């Protein structure tokens, strides 16, 4: 892998907040926009002299002190994770909720967030694959538009639309 430590120095102290000698965590860097919403584009810009700091969202634990945890149920891994990582301003364990997913999805829509990841509480971790036990449910925005034209596709889009002119 490529060392990118210099881009996010705010994350360098994470190891000191992990209550183990070694751990493998599943996490994602998040940078928030001016409205407090995650913005992937800002993640790409962060660490290059911008004033926006990234926050590491730690979702899961795959190993603790060289002991594999991927075969444990999600709720068991979640309990281990909460005992393992001490949150700070620069990393956190996002809140999770059991039940009433419909209300949670509606709340994310009201805040103009992307959606939720629904996980079976008894699911094991499947590295490198999409598992049916974890489903990404996105909020959809419906907009009525008039199509004024299109461009022809090229490359992998050959024989289809390249772009719609709206």
Show which residues each predicted segment covers.
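Catalytic cores of nucleic-acid ligases and guanylyltransferases
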Residues: 1-165
């Amino acid at each position: 892998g490529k060392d990118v430590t210099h881009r996010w120095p705010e994350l360098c102290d994470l190891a000191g907040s992990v209550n183990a000698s070694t751990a493998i965590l599943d996490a994602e860097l998040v940078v928030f926009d001016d409205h407090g919403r995650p913005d992937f584009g800002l993640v790409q810009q962060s660490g290059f002299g911008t004033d926006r700091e990234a926050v590491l969202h730690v979702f899961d634990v795959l190993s603790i002190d060289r002991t594999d945890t991927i075969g444990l149920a999600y709720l068991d891994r979640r309990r281990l994770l909460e005992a393992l990582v001490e949150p700070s301003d620069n990393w956190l364990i996002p809140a999770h909720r059991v039940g009433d997913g419909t209300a949670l999805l509606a709340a994310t829509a009201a805040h103009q967030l992307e959606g939720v990841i629904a996980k079976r509480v008894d699911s094991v971790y499947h590295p490198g694959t999409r598992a049916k036990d974890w489903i990404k449910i996105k909020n959809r925005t419906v907009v009525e538009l008039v199509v004024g034209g299109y461009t022809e596709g090229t490359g992998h889009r050959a024989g289809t639309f390249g772009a719609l002119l709206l």
